[in-house]
A protein has these predicted regions:
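Generic N-terminal initiation segments characterized by hydrophobic and/or small/turn-forming residues
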Residues: 2-3, 34, 50, 94
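N-terminal [4Fe-4S]-dependent radical SAM core
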Residues: 2-5, 16, 41, 53, ...
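Charged, often glycine-rich, active-site loop that binds/positions anionic groups
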Residues: 45-74
């Protein structure tokens, strides 16, 4: 059994569950892997407060949504390192797929995940998937050399196969 830490590197400060998360968890668990999720969405020192920004520039109607959110005051990098130290993952995976209403949120998730892993200490394999690696794999390898593997296309099954191989 491999240990896989899935990371949701969302910085937009709003809770939209990415469709890739439950599909990956389901397939990985069906292969008897131990899976944990680290969700970055509501860390105060990470969130970009996209709703406030888009309300100010009149893309969104004013709401009281921000008042209903409880942000985590802990340092995201320390929390991430703590989860890694305690869980001891074999693989850290994040994706840029179906994460937000706006396309820009999908494309920057590889970059956001990379920003997180650059500041942590781990021996885990770092793997990313989604739109960017599928569309331009060579560019991803050049831009993010500290990511060990990129998965093109649908990554659920491929990630499970990689995890299966790691445990052999």
């Amino acid at each position: 059994m491999s240990k896989i830490l899935l990371v949701q590197p969302n910085r937009w400060g709003r809770g939209i569950t990415s469709i890739w998360i439950p599909s990956h968890i389901g397939i990985l668990r069906s292969h008897n892997h131990d899976v944990k999720l680290f969700d970055c969405t509501f860390y105060k020192n990470w969130a970009e407060h996209e709703i406030e920004f888009n309300t100010e520039n009149q893309q969104y109607q004013p709401t009281d949504y921000q008042k209903k959110i409880k942000f985590n005051d802990n340092d995201i990098f320390q929390e991430f390192q703590k989860v890694i130290d305690e869980f001891k993952p074999d693989i850290i995976f994040w994706s840029a797929l179906s994460s937000h209403i706006h396309g820009e949120g999908e494309y920057v998730n590889i970059q956001y995940g990379n920003m997180l892993i650059e500041k942590i200490i781990t021996n885990a394999k770092k793997i990313a998937g989604g739109l960017q690696p599928t569309a331009e794999p060579e560019n991803m390898m050049k831009r993010f050399p500290n990511i060990d593997y990129f998965i093109r296309g649908e990554s659920e099954v491929v990630l499970a196969e990689i995890a299966d191989k790691l445990e052999q």
